[in-house]
Amino acid sequence: MKRYYDPEIFLQMLDGIDLDNHVVASYYLRDRLEGQKFLDHLSLVQALGLEGSTGTWEKVEEDTEAVRQAMSSKMVGYHEIPSDDPYVKSAVVQLAFPIRAWGDNVPMMLLAVAGNCFAYSKRIMLTDLFIGKELLKKFQGPKFGVDGIRKLSGVMERPLSLHIIKPKMGMTPEQTAHQVGLTAQGGADMCKDDEMLADAYNNTMEQRLPLVMREIDRVAQKTGKRMVYLCSITDEPQKMLDKARRAIDLGANGLLVTYSAGLGALRELTSHPDINVPVMLHASHMIAMMKQIAWPVLAKLCRLCGADMMLTPTMWSSIPMVSMEEGLRTSFVKLAPWGHIKRTFPMPCAGVYPGLAEVIIGEYGPDIIIPAGGGMLGHPDGYTAGAQSWQQAIAAVMAGV
């Protein structure tokens, strides 16, 4: 007898599987067929589950019951969302994937939970990802995290301010160092290259880094405060690791990589014993995926792979992309207890200015880094005054003024 719905996939529930050895992906599905009041969601769910595990579009003899029992994903949750539209069916679906299928291989895990499944429905989003304990043990996570960065910067309780070097590219190494020196004088805690700059023809990493660090040290001799500089090293994986080593040899006390380098490359970089400085993950490349993968999922994966700090969307941004709840949930995922994995510093960002300090800190709390480019450098009294205005705004909020 042929069953319409495979028992190996559907005769399951969350309470009955070995959660320690599974990854559980939660999806939002929404389908609409005009004039069709019957939508077979379970057939769609079955296709999603098999696509991320054992499935082929045509049954083959090697695809046995034993193979599916051991390797296929299992539907452990189906929660239909009521709709007044008879032609719409929406649900939150949970699929459990066995870790044995790919071990601690992050690219393969991402392929399973967020690969061809997106071809099966116009409205499908990966909303959460539960990582089983046996898989979690195999990841180091951030080396520094919130506590390590606080110790490095000397800022133990309040939010940190960060100067984004602007314009994105085009400046010489000397101009870059000069700009950093001015914001360091104003008390900025950190600075970073723009994500678009790595090795421009007129401003390579090896050219600017020594000049920037020299300027930071010059200011530190006067103020007693040494700014952390996150130097951009995004490149091909092996080149990026070599570049990171070179940057540290040249005095870098922080590194910046982008999501476009890949989660595997991020993990390789952050877990390498030679990399003894914090690593920031820039999330701009994630915007291309935000309609299909929720930001908290991406934040969780980046924390898992070792990001010490990571940009966080906020509705107060000049380019708001998410709701308040989605932005805050992204921050919570970075800070919530998670076994041995250290906390990742959230960085609510994009077009923020000192006048937003109260609402940003009120919503996100003190464990944040606030990056500002034009919102610091655009001060009418200059770059130093812009950095000072951020320090004053943060101090006022923390004092309850």
Give the location of each predicted region.
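Active-site mouth loops of central-metabolism enzymes
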Residues: 26-38, 159-178, 227-239, 284-293, ...
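Short Lys/Arg-enriched alpha/beta "domain-start" segment
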Residues: 1-71
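Acidic/glycine-rich phosphate/pyrophosphate-binding loops and surrounding catalytic core
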Residues: 106-178
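Catalytic alpha/beta core domains of metabolic enzymes, predominantly
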Residues: 242-245, 250-372, 385, 389
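Phosphate-/polyanion-interacting regions in eukaryotic proteins
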Residues: 56-137
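N-terminal small/glycine-rich loop or linker at the start of catalytic domains
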Residues: 23, 141-171, 217-227, 272-287
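Glycine-rich, proline-tolerant flexible connector loops at the mouths of alpha/beta enzymes
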Residues: 188-209, 314-317, 321
